[in-house]
């Protein structure tokens, strides 16, 4: 057979690997370790798409490579299986979310196995398994004991259609929910919060120690949002009330001409005048209908209402009006801001909208035309006049502290983590609320608190989860007869994914989250590969939980993931009409190399776009594996371009990768393999071993494959192939195309055993040296010939070769040679007359 029969060979080796537990994690204590982690998937009903295997193939290449280098390799897979989609589907269809999830997992696992990934399935985890979420609940109880999990009445992003509150991060810029695109309104509710802010400084500082891209680190830094400034206290005129604002520019306090409170600020009702009461109440209601993102959108029209009250500016005693406006959030900072319209664009727009005074306190701009937001020397600022920013801040903070109306302060943009969901399909929060007003955590001996099975998973309608409907589960009685009620909120999907990488290390431990010695052996994760869309939330939450567990003495490292790599997106093919509107692929026909709308006949422009069901451009890996084989898909996705680039899917590229594998198959199966080395491939073979090794180490898989192609081209020009080079080449291609490599290994090694643990080939540096070099021959200073000669010839040998060259002989025919200058490895210069 002259081609790679993937339909026969791939299932054969997948069966072999499963039967022999080929990829069981090594436990030889004398070997170094390598922990390669994929971001585990949510098992959706749609199954895998071709974007999933890109990251999975990258970690699989590294895992196979490291096994061959003698490492114990931990390369696991599992399922992030709680979450809204399964529950929504269950409500829509009447199916049990657990059954639906189990079916989806089975499908995902089938698809993953068909791609030949070397996972240790003995370590599979599932966040919905009570044996797993027992430890998710255990971590929560520890957070609760340490005061890091607490209840608070907070305004939440309520989504009526989903029947739950969602985190700020799950609200889209247009004010709708990320899941489903439903309207989001603000509503005060009792919620569980995790005090991630207690770890803000460590989460920020420890980024410096990580091998992550600067862009991802910057996203986390910006999310944490550290600001150094001052808290300033303003008294409310004619009352004993006061409020505090945080500002990074206390030096501009002389320019504060009004203050703004969040509509939800606790002082608003107390200070609002009778005349303004109705307007304030109306405005508060309107603000409650908007999400935080919609409220803080810089582009939106400025709205607000005066409360009728005045604050006293603490540095000059001036009375300045107190307004409420929805761009100030009660959950951010102190829920109050001092407005300096001359030097802040949003304040300037607000002042212009409502005809409020604008006082310049930094020279350099025209504040009637626009806010001046650069630095300058202080003016109109009494004792700060003439000072620069740094000196003025130091002086004003000292003044405020002396007067008792302010102090230096560090704040963070980071908010505490809203940890409750009013849904059924999640981990039950292990807390009991007693009728005597106390609350306690479910003791460890009673964990897991198992999610009860029920068909009634519709929201309760009271703002509580469907668990509130299950009286038998809900109501409990203590030994002393005191009655209690279980917490009805469940945890968010982020919970199980915040520590799953730890459970892979010891997945069957019933006594503890994981054994300390095993955690010491395997942590930190050596490389974590996944999409950049998780750059902030998942990674920040996982780092928070890891640091908490470090403080408890559970884990031995400060950070979970030493190296992080974000693969690019695989884009689909899309088509746009003259308006730029996208056209679904089933409405497109190809004629003479161009693309046309089937219904209108309009010629369309082809362009890459994110794969989506609506555009009908999603590529199913099952179809690719059926037609081309798993190894083709793996090689193609790695050869498309740099791993971190977003690149459009191409059927032609897929066919090219398949042709390459057929050429590899023919090379090994058809070429005469011999025990004697004639040296013809010494240089290209050793170059290939060196290049592929170095490029796998640096995740440059596309250039590694390109070098494998160079070797195949060179080998095909020879009549025979040296057996050690054949073996070495098969080992080099094995991480990329493992099924093909296993099959070809049997051809040349005939051991009957897997290639997986055969020692990785090495290169001979001496074989990389060029044996021949090019020299130039000059006659009267002009280049007349270029010759390939053996390296390091003597002057005499160079001269002899140059003078014997036919082209040179023709040039000097009939002329007298005055002298010949030879420079070894460079040139021969012939002087004639």
From Swiss-Prot:
Record's keyword annotation contains Ubl conjugation: no
GO MF annotations in UniProt: aminoacyl-tRNA deacylase activity; ATP binding; leucine-tRNA ligase activity
Motif 'KMSKS' region boundaries: 610-614
Catalytic activity annotation: tRNA(Leu) + L-leucine + ATP = L-leucyl-tRNA(Leu) + AMP + diphosphate
Binding site for ATP: 613
Cellular localisation: Cytoplasm
InterPro entries to which the protein is assigned, alphabetical: aa-tRNA-synth_I_CS (IPR001412), aa-tRNA-synth_Ia (IPR002300), Leu-tRNA-ligase (IPR002302), Leu_tRNA-synth_edit (IPR025709), M/V/L/I-tRNA-synth_anticd-bd (IPR013155), Methionyl/Leucyl_tRNA_Synth (IPR015413), Rossmann-like_a/b/a_fold (IPR014729), tRNAsynth_Ia_anticodon-bd (IPR009080)
Keyword line: Aminoacyl-tRNA synthetase, ATP-binding, Cytoplasm, Ligase, Nucleotide-binding, Protein biosynthesis
Organism of origin: Streptococcus pneumoniae (strain 70585)
Example GO biological process: leucyl-tRNA aminoacylation
Name of the protein this chain belongs to: Leucine--tRNA ligase
Chain's gene name: leuS
Family: Belongs to the class-I aminoacyl-tRNA synthetase family.
Motif 'HIGH' region, residue range(s) on this chain: 41-52
Top EC category: ligase
Primary location group: cytoplasm
Annotated HAMAP family: Leu_tRNA_synth_B
Any one of the GO CC terms: cytosol
Pfam families tied to this protein: Anticodon_1 (PF08264), tRNA-synt_1 (PF00133), tRNA-synt_1_2 (PF13603), tRNA-synt_1g (PF09334)
Keyword set includes ATP-binding: yes
E.C. number(s) listed in UniProt: 6.1.1.4
